[in-house]
């Protein structure tokens, strides 16, 4: 066994061995199932540090449950990531001077599949480096044939049941990527902007007007109304009156609607088709829809003089025109929220066009009913931490219908067909030669939303599906609760009449050392493969696991990674020490001590095992990590090994340490696999815990360690060498007359581990749990304490003199506050009292 831990040697070929031996792809159907769906990473590129954290948490659970005797299934897969992957592929084609217009959709699809295969292979290599216990025999892809069948089938089901409809509605549109977006694919970004206060003149009046504020004058041509709040008394006299659009000169009427906020600006709002809230008002008031911006972000012919201008260019020209006509009252510099596409980081326009939607109201009710049913925990998802259940609840109460169609070529084609008359048929196969399939594809989250059962080969009604659905837990970050978790939740209830997973562990994000989100723009991203190359996968895993608290972010820290490596190195050194132990005794120690020490460490191990099993159910990994660290550094290394050094306990110490390696395996799979084989010449994943029995009362060891620890702390405090003898006495607190049958054994261990001798008296008292420890003051300490005492006397003399001088000063007494004088007097009294005591 090598003297120094080398992660490159230890981790080499381990994952390949686990796959070859089918440790995680062979299933014992007599055991209780435990299943996890791996959140399918996008095939847009390589895995980042967040993926490493997410998969490490799941790998721990899978390995731990296997250790506990479960039949584990960890379903791997990748996501086709429609918009994101298509953008990457199109960029590659441009770099290769290939124009997508020169390729058919089928050829583009093949190019994307080439991309997918390339990056899926890269992702699998990264999974291997991390040591993930995935069942690769069950690997899936959200755009494979089985997924396509599942997607088509559930789309048809939802349509027939009235949950999917095609409607001409306002949607967010990405003018760069040329596709519609769902409400949660856009973000509000605060930017410097201008607020224009425009004059809307009362019809047939040259003097009376109302002021209406807008940040987007380019939408003026689509104005169809002005509104005030129904309770707005200040502006109520304008209700039903006509006003002149300052740009088009068309007449628009003043209406009332709750959307207008009284006392905000003038309290009057203009209504156009290029705002989601405005569109809702248009529907409520049954008004006309006029669009002035097209899907390319350019102006329509609603006003011919601005046609084909970009919206920003049109804004500049419209403002100039209105200024010339004195129709702008004022312009303010403000910060406003601009709606941006999260996909392309460009402005998302609100356009009205026919799209496919899922009605969210009935599904919101389904989830809310589950959440609010406190008496049926076995039938609802348990969130860790629970606050995310409340966050999901709030979102579901406000959910809009989900726009599921995308104007892309990469994705699941919508199983809808049109004839020449515009009739629609929704079915999985073509109705005939005169029918053309819808050219749009489905939102990526549609296929990943059904993954908990489609990856188990639904719609096949197999034993495989029945056994592993619902999955045991989903592990994901809080930033995709609405994108993914909510959709899996209602899709599972709808299709399977059951929740998709029993528990949801929601973790945070990994931030840099300054607490900033990692991003390409900041250049603060960290490649997990670089960390594995330098420190090893186990060091990275330990850092990620032991810094994990449900719902909270992690701040990346190189010092903590290095601390993880140091801990692993200590485990290596302990294992090497145990392997090199000679069975022949080198030191004769009482057999009673050896047996008690063995029993004591066994109890510590069993308690640790119970804690790990219990805390893993609630995902308290940081708590587990602290207890493991304590067991290694304090219980095993500082106490147990020190006690049994030189005994013939090699067999026991080897077995208890091997048991610990098995228990530690879910945290550090590479290291423990390697060390277990070194000690036992047997594979860890083919082994059970050694049966070890406890025969002694462990209070004896606990009491002795408490005494030794106190003596060691005293040495540290006064910087006393271990060579200097300490002298102590023990007095039982509970019963001073009771004979301590273990006293001689205690004396032996205290002498061995603390170099302290039992004596008849002591000047310093330490109160312990069951004893009063009385310690004689060593001469070295007496000298140091005398030096400290003299320094304190000199300090007190100086302070007393200073305080007396201040209090005898009439100016101080007359000018200082009563509180200040009182404080100084109290200070003097305290100093005099201490001086008399210490002298």
UniProtKB/Swiss-Prot annotation:
Motif 'KMSKS' region: chain residues: 517-521
GO terms, biological process: valyl-tRNA aminoacylation
GO cellular component: cytosol
Binding site residues for ATP: 520
GO molecular function, one term: ATP binding
Pfam families referenced in this protein's UniProt entry, alphabetically: Anticodon_1, tRNA-synt_1
UniProt xrefs under InterPro entries: aa-tRNA-synth_I_CS, aa-tRNA-synth_Ia, Anticodon_Ia_Val, M/V/L/I-tRNA-synth_anticd-bd, Rossmann-like_a/b/a_fold, tRNA-bd_arm, tRNAsynth_Ia_anticodon-bd, Val/Leu/Ile-tRNA-synth_edit
Localisation: Cytoplasm
Primary location class: cytoplasm
Catalytic activity: tRNA(Val) + L-valine + ATP = L-valyl-tRNA(Val) + AMP + diphosphate
CDD domains (UniProt xref): Anticodon_Ia_Val (cd07962), ValRS_core (cd00817)
Motif 'HIGH' region, residue numbers: 41-51
Alphabetical UniProt keywords: Aminoacyl-tRNA synthetase, ATP-binding, Coiled coil, Cytoplasm, Ligase, Nucleotide-binding, Protein biosynthesis
Domain of life from the UniProt record: Bacteria
Coiled-coil zones: 315-343, 813-839
EC number assigned by the record: 6.1.1.9
Record text on subunit structure and interactions: Monomer.
HAMAP family, alphabetized: Val_tRNA_synth_type1
Assigned protein family: Belongs to the class-I aminoacyl-tRNA synthetase family. ValS type 1 subfamily.
Purpose: Catalyzes the attachment of valine to tRNA(Val). As ValRS can inadvertently accommodate and process structurally similar amino acids such as threonine, to avoid such errors, it has a 'posttransfer' editing activity that hydrolyzes mischarged Thr-tRNA(Val) in a tRNA-dependent manner.
Domain writeup: ValRS has two distinct active sites: one for aminoacylation and one for editing. The misactivated threonine is translocated from the active site to the editing site. The C-terminal coiled-coil domain is crucial for aminoacylation activity.
Protein name, as recorded: Valine--tRNA ligase
Species of the source: Mycoplasma mobile (strain ATCC 43663 / 163K / NCTC 11711) (Mesomycoplasma mobile)
